[in-house]
Amino acid sequence: MKFSNLFSTRVASLAFAFLALIPAAEAHYTSATPPTSGPTVPGNKACLKDGVAYAPENAPEEVKRAIWATNFLRNKPYVWGGGHDSFYVDGYDCSGTVSFLLKHANRLDHPMASKELTNYGGSGKGRWITVYAKDGHVFAVVAGLRLDTSGMGFGEDGPRWRLTGRSAWGFTARHPEGL
């Protein structure tokens, strides 16, 4: 066999092997299981360290699991419509992010758009989780931390925990039953 044929055969084999790995990597990435345990802090308020939310020890297990699972999203990009068809995607928008949180609190079976979340659960603020929704945007406050996809500066868009609040003017406050 000539060197050029051998080289071409090996390059083609390597290329096919590499391409065969791509779907497997994508499937693993989009279907990865978020954690069901994580860091805690004493008391009733969550805290934020290096972008990771620490669940309050006094919170119900559903709230802790929701916080730990949502930490899984913290470096995902903002993608308009992300999380509407599935809880596990490459990027999330505001309603996909809040839907993910509520799913992991065992309070939501399917993703909901921001307008739908204006009628979610019970009216008013919750003890542990409050969803602030309006047509076009939604965010949540969980044990004192804000979960939102809109940041204050460049590169801050996407699912993130934040220490600072935001105006709830024009939003409807809702909460998961029991939380």
Question: What is each model feature region?
Answer:
Residues 2-14:
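Bacterial N-terminal signal peptides that target proteins for export
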